[in-house]
């Protein structure tokens, strides 16, 4: 178990000397007989690891085929949802909100990359939206926009984790989980339906 966690941590911190020192600190906490801090516990590490994998893939999505993108999302997004569901709730340790790292331009870059990858398949009809309370008809939604919203939340978390400050990491994790419950968890589930349909269409072709 410890070796598995160590491998995940070294992947996350890219194995540089400075980051390896921090990763080793996390490992020592996981091996300690006393309860580890919230941010060092295995559920948190596993959630952040999947979040980082998703971010890295989305930032390089132009290098992949449409079919690969769809299959990757159908693997990573359910895994991210599962890891978020298994994450115990933490408690904020600071006043104020964690720092936001993703700029409007970075968000738009990711959204556009996904939209270009999907083309006309980006749009789909959605019934699980806040705006549906004002409409009797399904509303057009976009896979690219929903995934970009998810990206923004988990990328901010990953960047806050890389500060290596426990209180910052803690509050970023708490904030990300709250946002998961409030909006991006539902958005994640929403896009799985059209992505699943697209994957079957590609098989038929």
Predicted segments, located by residue:
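Compositionally biased non-globular segments, especially hydrophobic aliphatic-rich helices
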Residues: 10, 24-26
């Amino acid at each position: 178990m410890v070796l598995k966690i160590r491998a995940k941590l070294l992947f996350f911190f890219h194995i540089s000397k400075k980051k390896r020192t921090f990763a080793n600190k996390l490992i020592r906490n996981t091996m300690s007989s006393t309860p580890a801090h919230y941010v060092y516990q295995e559920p948190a590490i596993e959630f952040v690891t999947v979040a980082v994998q998703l971010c890295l893939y989305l930032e390089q999505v132009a290098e992949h085929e449409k079919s690969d993108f769809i299959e990757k999302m159908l693997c990573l997004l359910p895994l991210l949802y599962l890891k978020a569901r298994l994450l115990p709730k933490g408690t904020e340790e600071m006043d104020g909100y964690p720092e936001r790292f993703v700029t409007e331009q970075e968000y738009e870059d990711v959204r556009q990359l996904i939209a270009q990858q999907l083309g006309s398949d980006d749009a789909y009809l959605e019934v699980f939206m806040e705006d549906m309370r004002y409409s009797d008809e399904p509303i057009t939604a976009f896979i690219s926009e929903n995934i970009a919203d998810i990206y923004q939340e988990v990328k901010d978390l990953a960047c806050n984790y890389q500060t290596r400050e426990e209180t910052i990491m803690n509050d970023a994790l708490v904030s990300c989980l709250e946002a998961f419950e409030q909006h991006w968890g539902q958005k994640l589930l929403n896009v799985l339906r059209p992505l699943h349909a697209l994957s079957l269409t590609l098989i038929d072709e």
